[in-house]
């Protein structure tokens, strides 16, 4: 009997670590992007939970009027939020060691900067990890490209907008009612509802929901029956089966007759590309719109654009929106400003000229 002994290659500790990091056999793929993603997202999540529960009030406007955001200071799940870093800090990098004490750091809203910056790094690395895993498996890279839309949106509201406005205090609070407050103030100051890029984003999100529901219902309605009436239709599918699980010809015929022939896709690949591209492109445009409005390139202004032969203004919906904007603007940060910026101008802006 002949025994063949194969000599095992001796690899360094670093080599074994690299192989483990990049192995696609792990239950959860780590990857080099994951090396940065894991600690940053863990940090952001941990600080968010602690601050949401127990952070003391924050002087968001820099006028010695702290705003409470945590559960232990009287909020509930809906009203609670991580309050943005104080206007007194502006855009300064404000880690814990830059403050005279932890109490001062908390009072000035240091946790917000810590959470946001770690979160943005983490989600960017998550996107890179999606690409990395796709690359290792020989897949195409479009999963990471699709994920770039929410990454761009988060970057716009948490980083680009504060940079444009000159302070992290203008960033979106990390909470439910804080998000709504951010949206209302954004409308008041930038007229986002009249910005074409926001309109494209609305079309992307609502259209994506519609197309997703249409596709799912069409596929579910044209499944190829593999079971009896006493069994679930889902039992007729085996993971990895070669044959189609639904009849795309039947779905195409149904939808083509419901609308018209060319409204229905006859190519499954182009259909799924469309389903991915529509919401992604819409959200890209919205993120781009937020990023331009950050520097005060605002939505369209059609105020008092319709007048009669005597020069009297005939109100349009644009004027109704403008009146609502002024009302929202005078109500927010009411102790920080005596008047909204529009009303505090020395000379009234030209409307018709």
Swiss-Prot record:
One Gene Ontology cellular component: chloroplast thylakoid membrane
Listed PROSITE patterns: REACTION_CENTER
Membrane topology, as annotated: Multi-pass membrane protein
Keyword hit for Acetylation: yes
Keywords on record: Acetylation, Calcium, Chlorophyll, Chloroplast, Chromophore, Electron transport, Herbicide resistance, Iron, Magnesium, Manganese, Membrane, Metal-binding, Oxidoreductase, Phosphoprotein, Photosynthesis, Photosystem II, Plastid, Thylakoid, Transmembrane, Transmembrane helix, Transport
Superkingdom of origin: Eukaryota
Protein name in the entry: Photosystem II protein D1
Catalysed transformations (reactions): 2 a plastoquinone + 4 hnu + 2 H2O = 2 a plastoquinol + O2
Subunit annotation: PSII is composed of 1 copy each of membrane proteins PsbA, PsbB, PsbC, PsbD, PsbE, PsbF, PsbH, PsbI, PsbJ, PsbK, PsbL, PsbM, PsbT, PsbX, PsbY, PsbZ, Psb30/Ycf12, at least 3 peripheral proteins of the oxygen-evolving complex and a large number of cofactors. It forms dimeric complexes.
Protein residues bound to pheophytin a: 126
Record Gene3D superfamilies: Photosystem II protein D1-like
Binding sites annotated in the UniProt record for Fe cation: 215, 272
Additional comment: 2 of the reaction center chlorophylls (ChlD1 and ChlD2) are entirely coordinated by water. Herbicides such as atrazine, BNT, diuron or ioxynil bind in the Q(B) binding site and block subsequent electron transfer.
Residue span(s) of the pro-peptide: 345-353
Top enzyme class: oxidoreductase
Residues bound to chlorophyll a ChlzD1: 118
Function field: Photosystem II (PSII) is a light-driven water:plastoquinone oxidoreductase that uses light energy to abstract electrons from H(2)O, generating O(2) and a proton gradient subsequently used for ATP formation. It consists of a core antenna complex that captures photons, and an electron transfer chain that converts photonic excitation into a charge separation. The D1/D2 (PsbA/PsbD) reaction center heterodimer binds P680, the primary electron donor of PSII as well as several subsequent electron acceptors.
CDD domains hit by this protein: Photosystem-II_D1
Residues that coordinate or bind chlorophyll a PD1: 198
E.C. number: 1.10.3.9
Record-annotated site: Tyrosine radical intermediate: 161
Signal peptide positions on this chain: none
Site note Cleavage, residues: 344-345
Chain residues that bind [CaMn4O5] cluster: 170, 189, 332-333, 342, 344
PTM comment, free text: Tyr-161 forms a radical intermediate that is referred to as redox-active TyrZ, YZ or Y-Z.
GO terms of molecular function: chlorophyll binding; electron transporter, transferring electrons within the cyclic electron transport pathway of photosynthesis activity; iron ion binding; oxidoreductase activity, acting on diphenols and related substances as donors, oxygen as acceptor; oxygen evolving activity
